[in-house]
């Protein structure tokens, strides 16, 4: 996002409701530098700050994508599960949109083994191998495959921990953020008025409850990622 486009983007952000925060009493004082003052009932995000920080995050994402870095998008709330999956697939990112299993990053060796099992079971199913096994054994294998699909469908092609992780809800995915911090994985995250902007490397002050707001922010980030990958392919 270039500075000359900020005015247009500010209008779009207003229309998307990016600036609406939580009730005044429900806030995190650490987010204060990014808010408008003298708001009584609802905290209002200063979208000029949002535009600037989003521009920084987009530049970072473009450069990282150009270098071949791998991204993961995390958003495990039921209301945004579909949006997360659709957005991640368009940008060819890994994603987690159901439940974050503890150790997905910090215990990668175990997760890698489970992904290999996932790949093996899917290959057997596609090849029709289940048709030649005892019913009880097939039932067990199908249950395993169902569970693996539920939790790992968005990372089934992931061969290593991601280089960058994007979060859309800090409170919902706090455990995942802590794993990134522990491993030193750079993070980009939407931070609403009840969030701590210091928990992610690149905070983007924005309404994280409204699907329109989330979709707008993610569209900017994924466009930046695709631009970086496109540039890399041309070189």
Curated annotation (Swiss-Prot):
It comes from the Eukaryota. Keywords: Chloroplast, Plastid, Ribonucleoprotein, Ribosomal protein. GO terms for biological process: translation. This is Small ribosomal subunit protein uS2c. Belongs to the universal ribosomal protein uS2 family. It is found in: Plastid, Chloroplast. One of its GO terms (cellular component) is chloroplast. InterPro entries: Ribosomal_uS2, Ribosomal_uS2_bac/mit/plastid, Ribosomal_uS2_CS, Ribosomal_uS2_flav_dom_sf. The gene is rps2. GO terms for molecular function: structural constituent of ribosome. The lineage of its organism: Eukaryota, Viridiplantae, Streptophyta, Zygnematophyceae, Zygnematophycidae. The keyword Ribosomal protein applies.
